[in-house]
UniProtKB/Swiss-Prot annotation:
Family to which the UniProt record says this protein belongs: Belongs to the bacterial ribosomal protein bL25 family. CTC subfamily.
Subunit structure: Part of the 50S ribosomal subunit; part of the 5S rRNA/L5/L18/L25 subcomplex. Contacts the 5S rRNA. Binds to the 5S rRNA independently of L5 and L18.
Function: This is one of the proteins that binds to the 5S RNA in the ribosome where it forms part of the central protuberance.
Biological process annotations from GO: translation
Keywords per UniProt: Ribonucleoprotein, Ribosomal protein, RNA-binding, rRNA-binding
Any one GO CC term of the record: cytosolic large ribosomal subunit
Region spans: Disordered: 198-223
Organism, as annotated: Thermomicrobium roseum (strain ATCC 27502 / DSM 5159 / P-2)
Protein name (database record): Large ribosomal subunit protein bL25
One Gene Ontology MF term: structural constituent of ribosome
């Protein structure tokens, strides 16, 4: 079995506004849900261990959450941040059935270099792909090799990207993932993306204490 980052914690008995005291003690409140737990388990986890694990695997890989001596392989499904201080307020963990595939969204990572005769700017039009795999087989990212591009081939579609063994593509295979564009077109696309990101960032979001959920994982168990 793949080795996972470890985060230690304990069952939480403090709720509501009282969880502020937990944070002052270096504990981050959260909850474990999923098919392997009969009912949601409120937890408090070590703040520094969680932050290290989150920065290392994000929402793309499993973390071993050890609660009172019991280990739960979990995905970090949602992290709520304070809208001003960006302090982590609450975490939702998802404990999957390791024997059943899950459908998740993972980021795209470009590797390799363009051939010298390919002129233009590489744009990632689809930064994430939806895939299906067993929880322990979910890759941290999907690599897209830029050396496959040429003067005749300026686009890479989702269905053309090689996937690791045991991983199936759920995204439409005809979706454009990477494209070589002229500089002016790339700048216009980048500006449109920036404006959209600012508009999304300005939208009000409801969560604990006005928190803004980040990195909400598109994750579900496959039928």
């Amino acid at each position: 079995m793949t080795e996972h980052p470890v985060v230690n914690g304990e069952r939480r008995t403090v709720f509501g506004k009282k969880v502020k005291r937990l944070r002052r003690l270096g504990r981050t409140p959260g909850v474990i849900a999923g098919p392997v737990v009969p009912e949601p388990i409120p937890v408090a986890v070590d703040e520094r261990e969680f932050e290290r694990a989150f920065h290392h695997v994000g929402t793309a890989r499993l973390v071993d959450l050890v609660v009172d001596g019991t280990t739960y392989p979990v995905f970090i499904r949602e992290v709520a941040l304070h809208p001003v201080t960006r302090e982590i307020l609450n975490v939702e963990f998802y404990a999957p059935d390791l024997a059943r595939p899950v459908t998740v969204t993972v980021p795209v990572l470009t590797v390799g270099e363009l051939a010298p005769d390919v002129v233009g700017v590489v744009t990632i039009q689809t930064p994430e792909l939806e895939i299906r795999a067993l929880p322990d087989a979910v890759p941290e990212h999907i690599e897209v090799d830029l050396s496959l591009l040429s003067t005749e081939r300026t686009v890479i579609h989702a269905g053309e990207i090689p996937l690791p063994v045991g991983v199936e593509l759920e995204t439409d295979p005809d979706v454009v993932v990477v494209v070589v564009e002229e500089a002016e077109e790339a700048e216009a696309a980048e500006e449109a993306t920036r404006v959209l990101a600012e508009e999304i960032g300005d939208r009000p979001r409801s969560a604990e204490e006005g928190a803004a959920p980040v990195k909400e994982r598109k994750l579900r168990e496959s039928e």
